[in-house]
Amino acid sequence: MEVLLRRLASADAARCLSTSLVGSISDKCIRAGPSCRTRFPFRFGSLCSFSDSSNESNACSVSSENEAAVNCNGFRTWRNGGGTFHHSACIDPTALIETGAVVHSNSVVGASVRIGSGSVIGDAVTIGQSTRIGYNVALSNCTVGDFCVIHNGVCIGQDGFGFFVDEHGTMKKKPQMLNVKIGTNVEIGSNTCIDRGSWRDTVIGNSTKIDNLVQIGHNVIIGDCCMLCGQVGIAGSVTIGDYVTLGGRVAIRDHVSIGSKVRLAALSCVTKDIKEPGDYGGFPAIPISAWRRQIAKLSQSSRKK
């Protein structure tokens, strides 16, 4: 009888230990993503079979029918905010993913990141620590640095605008296979669009600030500490140096290079390279003193008439 009692006590202890262990491992795997499955190569569903029925919901988060169905598609509910994430994503426990936001497979979300409702984080996107992402943001094919602010409605990493006409006169799309790289401490205003690259990555430098409704084409490289005001349009394959300021509605044609410490007046249009630092304006953009003289002469001639 004593032997039987000892065996029963040992079985109860083992069952309690397995329940505690399963709960701990499943909790870590939810947060750690693919690296955890390398150390623990088993399915979440199999964990539930080890736990006692009374503690099943605590030991494994896929115990209910609804959550199990979600897990069949690879998506689960993030406990901090109620958003949805793919089981292969790696998300820091301090990140907040609001209800209605989705983080897709193999993405990495850093510490203290906040993702607003309606935002979609595509496959293999990386978001650095303490970055704030607003509502209805779409990120794909990109990496975002630390301490960035991305306002509502921003789209980053979509196809660039590249087409060609084949021998039959049919318009065909050029492949846009590369990425967008956003530096640290970057702020991007509402409804701005940044296209991914085709032959080189699109790059936004550290501490650059971008206003609302800005279009940045594929293969564009923007340096550090630049300021882009509202409705700026930058065509593909443009290179911009550091500490450049673009006034409202500035337009820059494709394959143009602009040196560091250049400032462009509002409504300017850049049609050729600008190598020297200074202030520029007009269409086409020229040194601002020359542009002002042109405006003065035009005003005088119109008065004489």
Residue ranges and their predicted role:
Residues M1-S88, P93-T94, F147, G153-Q176, ...:
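Terminal amphipathic alpha-helical/low-complexity segments used for targeting or macromolecular assembly
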